[in-house]
Amino acid sequence: MGGQEIALYADGDRLVVDACCITGRQDTLFLGPLPPHEVKPGGFIGPKQYAPRRVGRQYFRRCRIEGDVDFIFGGARAYFEGCEIRSLNRDMDVNGYVTAVSTPKGEPYGFVFHGCSFTALDGVAPDSVYLGRPWRECAQTALIDCWLGRHIKREGWWDWNKPAAHSCAQYAGAILHGPAGDTTDWVPWANKLDVMAAAGYAREQVLAGADGWDPEGGDGDAVETAGLSANGRTVHIETYCEDEPALRARLKREGRSAAFARQTPADFEAWKIATRTRLCDVLGLSLMDRAPNEIR
C-alpha cells in the first residue's frame, strides 16, 4: 500500500483542530500554503495553486496523526500540542519521514511540536524513520519536550539531497525523552536547544502574529508528556478513543437528563455552567471552563 493519501488539506488562518484522529499513509496532513512553484512538473499543487501564498496559523491539540512518508507537510506556522505522531510500517530500510516542511524564507516559525509523542506501530524497525526532510530549503521544525520512540533515526533529519538546506533549514530540539531522545548523533546542521532557547517556542509566541492570537487564551496546563505509557502514547489518546460506544451512550443519557426546563435568564446562566461541568466530567477534561460562554 502506498501513494499519496491526504486526509486533511488545511489552508487558512487561526485554524484549531482538537482531539481528532487524522490517518493516512503518504502525505496525510497538508498545512498550507503551497510553495510558490513546483520543483518539477507533476509535483504537488493542490486546489489553491493560483491563490496568493499566505502563511496561516494552525493549532493541533490532543490529536493522533499517522502515516509513513512526509505525512505532515506544508508551509504553515503550525503548533502541535500533546499529540501522538504515529509512524506506520512500509517494510523498507528507510521506513518513512514524519515531516516535509516548506516554510517560506524569512518566516520566524514553521512546525513546532510541544509535548508530543512520536510512536510507531508494531513492526516498524528501530532507527528507520527520519523526523523530517526539507520540502523547501528553509524548512523549520522544532521539537520541545517530546517523547521519541526507538523507530526514530539517530541522526534525526535528512537533507533530501539539498545542500542549501544546511544553511537555511532550521531543525531544533530540546528536552527530549524516550529511546531516541538523545540528540548527540543528530546531523551537525540541526540545533540542540537549551531550556532558555526552548522558551522561545511557547505557543502564545509562535501563534501570536500581528493580532496576538492564542487559541488557549493564556498559559496552558501541562501536557501529558510526563505521564506517558511505556510505548509513549499520551494519556488523552486512550481517554478519547477507547470504548466509544459506551461514551456515546453516556453522552446521550446525559443530554436527555440535562435538557433546560426552567424559564428565567438567571436559570439559563446557571444551567450553562452546570452543563459544562457535567460535560467536563464525562470527557475527563479540566479546560472547558477557561473559555467564556459566547453567543455565536
Regions found by a protein language model. Name each.
Residues 245-296:
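Non-catalytic accessory segments flanking enzyme active sites
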